């Protein structure tokens, strides 16, 4: 019951702030899971919204220069460095609405960027 009330309250705040002619500044807030989806439905309306769950990191790793020799020839140190770089590359690529609005607070203008 409390979760439903919190969800309804969050949507009401977004609705009031996004009402045309409203002089209030949209407060940035964390929106995750169903709260994020509901906020997108509210903000985007009939236009709908798009969502790309996770970009393929392997496509971007194809831009890296080929390795000279294998991990055995290069030594264990290079193998560790290679895996650390791949993790760092994945962190740089994984950006989207979840990172923008769930991990960090976002406002109504951020949500509008995901509308069709």
From Swiss-Prot:
Residues 56-93 form a propeptide. Gene3D superfamilies: Insulin-like (1.10.100.10). One of its GO terms (cellular component) is extracellular space. The keyword Calcium does not apply. Disulfide bonds join 32-102, 44-115, 101-106. GO terms for molecular function: hormone activity. Insulin decreases blood glucose concentration. It increases cell permeability to monosaccharides, amino acids and fatty acids. It accelerates glycolysis, the pentose phosphate cycle, and glycogen synthesis in liver. This is Insulin. The gene is ins.
